[in-house]
From Swiss-Prot:
Span of the signal peptide: none
EC number from the UniProt entry: 1.11.1.12, 1.11.1.9
CDD domains (UniProt xref): GSH_Peroxidase
Protein name as catalogued: Phospholipid hydroperoxide glutathione peroxidase
Organism per entry: Hylobates lar
Phosphoserine modifications at: 40
Lineage: Eukaryota, Metazoa, Chordata, Craniata, Vertebrata
Encoding gene, per UniProt annotation: GPX4
Keyword Oxidoreductase: yes
The protein's enzyme class: oxidoreductase
Amino acid sequence: MSLGRLCRLLMPALLCGALAAPGLAGTMCASRDDWRCAGSMHEFSAKVLDGHTVNLDKYRGFVCIVTNVASQUGKTEVNYTQLVDLHARYAECGLRFLAFPCNQFGKQEPGSNEEIKEFAAGYNVKFDMFSKICVNGDDAHPLWKWMKIQPKGKGILGNAIKWNFTKFLFDKNGCVVKRYGPMEEPLVLEKDLPHYF
């Protein structure tokens, strides 16, 4: 095989992170159009509630739980209460939470980012809250599209997010290690956490 042909074959892998240095691939491969080639959550970015864009590489070396949230869901009280409790007990161990408000399920997150921030403050939320996004469909945030196709991020009866408070557990390398359905309360995750610290 010629060197030119070898380069043409390897270039897509290099650009999509399979062989690239950590962090470099994220700037090239986690956009709205080419999210499939990301190697970890660290290659994505998202806007926090105040509108600033955050590179998710900041979570490198931390165990993370990513969830979609809503303020007017029947599961809101138990999920927010337990997420805050887990964060208080495990943040010092290296656990981080990324909460993404979403209005796709029963229109149960209708508020503005400022209203969502005020609502979360009522639960004394100290973990990271991101701007409202879509988690399903063509307009879904690239991170959420990517999570759902990971080997351990796939759902039951299809990969679509079924409801509010679907949770994904990530290891320190930014890889999905488990998906939890919306009926599984956050404390269910606690038994799995020690495997990843």
